[in-house]
From Swiss-Prot:
One Pfam family named in its UniProt record: RecR_HhH
Mapped zinc finger ranges (C4-type): 61-76
Gene: recR
Residue ranges occupied by any Toprim domain in the UniProt entry: 84-170
Protein name: Recombination protein RecR
One GO MF term attached to the UniProt entry: DNA binding
PANTHER family the record matches: RECOMBINATION PROTEIN RECR (PTHR30446:SF0)
Organism in which the protein naturally occurs: Helicobacter pylori (strain Shi470)
Function: May play a role in DNA repair. It seems to be involved in an RecBC-independent recombinational process of DNA repair. It may act with RecF and RecO.
Alphabetized UniProt keyword annotations: DNA damage, DNA recombination, DNA repair, Metal-binding, Zinc, Zinc-finger
Family statement: Belongs to the RecR family.
């Protein structure tokens, strides 16, 4: 007897797709689908166009793995940035968050996963850019502490200074859930790893 819902396949498919977005529940997905499908179809078309453009143009920077629309991102190609510091982060979105603080003027390296790290390319970059310090900007967890130790061990022959952001960042919390003042203080109070 559920024929009404069965007759709305396209709408329910949209709800289902929106619900797959992280942090979007069924109710929020339903509200978005209703808004886009009925109340503001122009916005839906605009979003569709923006998604097509993003999918067509977004890529990973060949140097740091951050998001870019060219082979090398704006940060890596900016000659005014400090070459002596390399900030390692876990996700491309972390670069956005740290850049918004305007506290760091060095370079970045995004670790998508430890399995994907090309240590040969990273070592070449350390030499070419004359990196002296690696800053680990990871949320504090035991797994991330192990990751820092592993990276330090792999790169110890470079005699780098290894630091990590201070423990003002709550354990188990992602950067997007931390206010900018706390994150800025933690970043500026980083300690030797």
């Amino acid at each position: 007897m559920n024929t009404y819902k069965n007759s709305l396949n396209h709408f329910l498919n949209l709800v289902d797709c929106l619900e797959k977005i992280p942090n979007v529940g069924k109710k929020s997905a339903f509200k978005m689908a209703y808004h886009l499908g009925l109340e503001n179809p122009y916005l839906a078309l605009k979003i569709t166009h923006a998604l097509e453009n993003a999918l067509e143009n977004l890529k990973r920077c060949a140097s740091c793995n951050a998001l870019s629309e060219s082979e090398i991102c704006e940060i890596c190609s900016d000659e005014s940035r400090q070459n002596s510091q390399l900030c390692m982060v876990l996700h491309p979105r972390d670069v956005f968050i740290l850049e918004d603080l305007k506290d760091f003027l060095g370079r970045y390296y995004v670790l998508n996963s430890i399995e994907e790290v090309d240590f040969n390319a990273l070592e070449k970059r350390l030499i070419e850019e004359n990196i002296k310090e690696i800053i680990f900007a990871f949320p504090p967890t035991l797994a991330n502490d192990s990751l820092m130790l592993y990276i330090e061990d792999k790169l110890q022959h470079f005699h780098l200074t290894f630091t990590k952001i201070a423990q003002g960042v709550p354990t188990g919390v992602n950067f997007e859930n931390i206010d900018s003042v706390s994150l800025s203080r933690a970043f500026n109070s980083r300690i030797k790893a």
